[in-house]
A protein has these predicted regions:
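Membrane-proximal helix-turn-helix segments that form the acceptor-binding/catalytic region
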Residues: 89-93, 98, 116-133
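Glycosyltransferase donor-sugar binding loop
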Residues: 207-223
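Conserved donor-binding/catalytic core segment of Leloir-type glycosyltransferases
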Residues: 168-186, 192-195, 208-209
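Short hydrophobic beta-strand element within catalytic cores of glycosyltransferases
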Residues: 279-284
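Nucleotide-activated donor-binding/catalytic signature segment of Leloir-type glycosyltransferases, i.e.
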Residues: 222-242, 248
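Donor nucleotide-sugar binding/catalytic pocket of nucleotide-sugar-dependent glycosyltransferases
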Residues: 129-165
Length: 352
């Protein structure tokens, strides 16, 4: 086991042969974090060498002896510092020694709160100024960046992963499933309240299944949501992190998949639901409309005015929640990153 804060080779399959001129991708953070995992996956898809580092404090030592070649960072500010300003300073320090390109994740938006948005926007502006190339994962994120005065060089959508069909699938009788790290942005409390309303109305078999683990600092929030459903007579389950080999089965078992987002700029979990052949119930938003345009028929969009009623109808007939899985998009992801780096004037191809 690799000690926290140390660099380590990518787990699992070996990295592909490096693509000529590709920057070193730094996958910063715990391996189970979604952004860290995506950094590794996108690097492998693009044929980019990967350096995995658990903590930002370990970056200087991990890069020692590697020269001053270009690097690519996948950034969400909590991975790079205890505060947004600390995160920006860490990227600026790195960019002082070598060319840096970045993919900005979790782009700030007002829905997360005005003061938090202000602090994070200032940090993302500093990061973008330090970077020679800025990538985001949706047109919605591009618009958010434009509103903040951040120029985006490329939009590379999050791909549908390759899950494959489950070996054994036993669909639940009456369950509502929420997938991924559990926190207020996933509106777990709202889903729990809708499940509680159905249970209180006589649905004795309904189960709230939370297919993931609480995000750091949100155990009490998840516990409160579970208690809401349980107090009304509903059944509850928290699986903890779902192993990759079990994803297709676990996501395929739930009766009604739900992916409500209070504030989202791009979401990998929607692609994972699709890869499992599921069409989740989602709140309408700019990003959701963008995803429905890109993958027509992949989402069940609701205005949220009667979530309990939406769930009741789908529990009675869950067939609209099942779709043929779209083809995986990992190869296209790799091509898109290579194309973006090729246009980087101070990056690969432009370095002495």
């Amino acid at each position: 086991m690799t000690a926290p804060g140390s660099a380590a080779p990518s787990p699992g399959a070996a990295d592909p042969a490096p693509h000529p001129g590709a920057p070193l991708t730094i996958a910063l953070g715990p391996p189970e974090h979604g952004v860290t995992r995506f950094a590794v996956d996108s690097a492998r898809a693009a044929g980019t060498p990967v350096l995995e580092v658990r903590e930002v404090a370990a970056l200087p030592a991990a890069l020692a002896g590697r020269g001053r070649g270009p690097v690519h960072l996948h950034i969400t500010d909590p991975l790079f510092g205890r505060t947004p300003d600390e995160a920006a300073a860490a990227v600026e320090a790195l960019a002082a020694d070598r060319p840096v390109s970045v993919t900005l994740h979790d782009v700030p938006q007002l829905a997360e709160g005005a003061e938090r948005c202000r602090r994070r926007t200032r940090a993302y502006q500093c990061i973008a100024r330090a970077a020679g190339l800025v990538v985001v994962s949706s047109e919605h994120e591009r618009r958010l960046c434009a509103d903040a005065g951040i120029a985006v060089d490329a939009v590379i959508p999050l791909p549908v992963p390759a899950l494959g069909p489950p070996a054994d699938l036993s669909p639940d009788a009456r369950s509502v499933g929420v997938f991924g790290f559990l926190h207020p942005g996933k509106a777990v409390d709202v889903v729990a309240e809708a499940v509680a309303a159905l249970a209180a109305g006589g649905d004795a078999d309904i189960t709230l299944r939370l297919l993931g683990a609480p995000a750091d600092g949100h155990d009490d929030y998840v516990d409160a949501a579970l208690q809401t459903a349980r107090a009304a007579g509903g059944r509850v389950e928290v699986t903890g992190r779902v192993d990759d080999e079990d994803l297709a089965r676990v996501l395929g078992e739930v009766t009604v998949p739900v992916a409500l987002f209070r504030n989202v700029s791009a979401s990998g979990s929607l692609g994972t639901w699709a890869a499992a052949g599921r069409r989740p119930l989602v709140w309408d938003s700019d990003y959701i409309r963008e995803m429905e345009h890109d993958r027509p028929g992949s989402l069940l969009i609701t205005d949220g005015t009667d979530l309990a009623g939406d769930l009741r109808r789908l529990l009675g007939d869950p067939s609209p929640t099942r779709i043929p899985p779209p083809p995986p998009g990992i190869e296209e992801l790799g091509r898109a990153y290579r194309a973006a780096w090729a246009q980087w004037p101070t990056g690969p191809g432009g370095l002495a």
